[in-house]
A protein has these predicted regions:
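Core catalytic lobe of class I
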Residues: 2-104
Length: 104
């Protein structure tokens, strides 16, 4: 069985801790802000830019994978920031849901 560790907390703070400890990750799964100001919340004020994704890359082993969720209206900005930071965009997985259906 593989060994894994789930890290929860402020992303940049935790990433810098990993880098300082010379610990490298195989993959990153993240759901960053979509930049839609969801329900007027401060945490959804913008989309992480190039610098954010550069820091994430510094904590990754060569060949690591990144899975980042994004909103349909701002996904293009997220993807460009990731690519500008040096990540290779290989594939895009989309779940396009027009509306939530009621189950009887």
């Amino acid at each position: 069985m593989s060994k894994f560790k789930l890290i929860h907390g402020d992303c940049l703070e935790k990433t810098n801790t990993l880098i300082s400890a010379n610990m490298w990750v195989d993959s990153v799964v993240t759901d960053p802000p979509y930049g839609l100001k969801f329900m007027g919340k401060d945490w959804d004020h913008g989309i992480p830019g190039k610098h954010f994704w550069e820091v994430i890359m510094q904590a990754c082993k060569p060949g690591a994978h990144l899975l980042a969720f994004g909103g349909t209206r701002t996904f293009h900005r997220l993807t460009c920031a990731i690519e500008d930071a040096g990540w290779e965009i290989r594939d895009c997985i989309m779940w396009v849901r027009a509306r939530v259906s009621k189950i009887a």
